[in-house]
Design a protein with these regions (language model features):
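C-terminal output helix
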Residues: 109-118
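Active-site beta3 strand of CheY-like receiver
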Residues: 47-53
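Short, conserved "switch-loop" micro-motifs in signal-transduction and mechanochemical regulators
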Residues: 87-88
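Two-component/phosphorelay signaling modules centered on CheY-like receiver
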Residues: 13-32
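Receiver (REC) domain active-site loop signature in two-component systems and cognate sites
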Residues: 58
Length: 124
């Protein structure tokens, strides 16, 4: 079986490094990265990741908008999307689900919970 591909999207290089480190240390998944919603859309369409983990607050296009746009395109419509942010208020979480995300986690990310969430969406 080919290695699963995860698209990690965050404008923070530190957050990307941390998420990538968790994934690569504990799985055989291949990590792709993007630093904003526009790059995320381009990579999601060209690389066909198995799942997208995306920050909400980013320059150029935020995670809510990128999620909505991914749901509009045939090629990216069915890709599971997990939104990540420091804000955990109920209204903010609801806005994430209304944008089309499958799940929502808050920072700081717990490595074990993050891996379990990824594996649950990837059927492992």
């Amino acid at each position: 079986m080919a290695s699963r591909k995860i698209l990690l999207v965050d404008d923070s290089k530190t957050a990307l490094l941390m998420e990538r480190s968790i994934v690569e240390r504990h799985t055989s998944y291949k990590c792709l990265t993007a630093s904003n919603g526009i790059e995320a859309l381009e990579k999601a369409q060209s690389e066909s990741p198995d799942i997208v983990v995306m920050d909400v607050v980013m320059p150029q296009m935020n995670g809510f908008e990128a999620c909505k746009k991914m749901r509009e395109h045939e090629k990216t419509r069915a890709i599971p999307i997990i939104l990540v942010t420091t804000r955990g208020e109920e209204a903010y979480i609801e806005a994430g689900f209304q944008s089309g995300c499958n799940d929502y986690i808050t920072k700081p990310i717990n490595g074990q919970e993050f891996l379990k969430l990824l594996q649950s969406y990837l059927g492992e």
